[in-house]
């Protein structure tokens, strides 16, 4: 076997298979991350809300919206900042939770 066959023969066939396995793993990992974000524990304070390991002040949101079974806290920052730092937060809908959020934010 020469070096050319080794580089582009067997090892080349290995690369697409490896990439497909990595993509499948990333898809499962992203699903787990999304699922864990929905099921995160929250604490509500007078000056903000704690979701998981992050704390958000009420003035970082411009309002809230009820979508299906979730309450969406809408960030007031531009899209670029929202994609990196402060994102919209989705909380499972609960009447008591909506009443608390209603005191601090207005509905859109």
Swiss-Prot record:
Signal peptide span: 1-24
Keywords of the record: Signal
Similarity remark: To M.jannaschii MJ0803.
Protein name, entry field: Uncharacterized protein MJ0695
Biological source species: Methanocaldococcus jannaschii (strain ATCC 43067 / DSM 2661 / JAL-1 / JCM 10045 / NBRC 100440)
């Amino acid at each position: 076997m020469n070096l050319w066959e080794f580089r582009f023969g067997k090892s080349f066939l290995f690369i697409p298979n490896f990439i497909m396995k990595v993509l499948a793993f990333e898809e499962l990992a992203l699903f787990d991350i999304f699922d864990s974000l929905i099921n995160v524990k929250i604490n509500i304070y007078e000056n903000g809300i704690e979701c998981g390991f992050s704390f958000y002040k009420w003035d970082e949101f411009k309002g809230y919206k009820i979508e299906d079974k979730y309450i969406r806290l809408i960030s007031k920052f531009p899209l670029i900042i929202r994609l990196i730092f402060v994102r919209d937060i989705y909380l499972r809908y609960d009447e008591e939770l909506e009443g608390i959020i209603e005191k601090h934010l207005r509905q859109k």
